[in-house]
From Swiss-Prot:
Component of a cohesin-like complex composed of ScpA, ScpB and the Smc homodimer, in which ScpA and ScpB bind to the head domain of Smc. The presence of the three proteins is required for the association of the complex with DNA. It comes from the Bacteria. It comes from Enterococcus faecalis (strain ATCC 700802 / V583). Gene3D superfamilies: 6.10.250.2410, Structural maintenance of chromosome 1. Chain E. Keywords: Cell cycle, Cell division, Chromosome partition, Cytoplasm. NCBIfam families: PRK00104.1-4. One of its GO terms (cellular component) is cytoplasm. One of its GO terms (biological process) is cell division. It holds the Pfam family SMC_ScpA. Participates in chromosomal partition during cell division. May act via the formation of a condensin-like complex containing Smc and ScpB that pull DNA away from mid-cell into both cell halves. This is Segregation and condensation protein A. HAMAP family: ScpA. InterPro entries: ScpA (IPR003768), ScpA-like_C (IPR023093).
Amino acid sequence: MSFLQEINLKLDVFEGPLDLLLHLIQKLEIDIYDIPITAVTEQYMSYIHAMQTLELEVAGEYLVMAATLMAIKSQMLLPKQELEIIDDEDFFEEEDPREALVAQLLEYRKFKYAATVLHEKEEERKLYYTKEPMDMDDYKEEDTTLPPNQINTIDLFLAFHAMLEKKKNRQPVETTVASDDVSIEEKISAISERMRQVQKGKAVSFDSFFDSYSKQEIVTTFMALLELMKTGAIYAEQENNYSEILLFNTETQQEDTTEVEETQ
């Protein structure tokens, strides 16, 4: 079994391809009724390619959606035609190839919202007791909405893919496995130590963790960063869709003006 095959990481980021598409639409701040299919397809394929680079299993439904997006993109590139019917002044325009996808997204968003409301009601119901009212403030759920500029693991996947593309342009990524393998646990320990040394109010550039051109080293580092984000030890911020991603130590970070730590 290869090194990458031994990696066992479950990423509960999305419930399916429609969930991923909704995230991308929100991230790109676009109108769901007028989806720029080229931009969305590029972002979607970046996520798929990142998963394949890490040799993580990509569910078939994601690949089906990828094929659907590519088909829609191809149709959108074809010259628009108008079919004349009976009266020369009346025209029947071709159906927008995005129409079926938009309908699916709207339907999914509706049911997702309903599921969220039902879950909130269920959680509220758990706080009801058949005794005298009492202060339940200490038992309220924390707000899980990410603060402004803070990003989640899917954005990190997209940044990871972009970083790999930049490395390919500079020098091919080595695919051989070195004899002195570093485990994910060891890499987590090394990254944690580095983050502990970061002063309050400062951040570390995401790209600064990827000096190596070894595929094993790159993948191990990325897996370690994902695990640290999952456990809440670190968090990531990005000012806008194309700016640098910064990593912060959750324990020591304060609401100060941040500076990017120089690459060590």
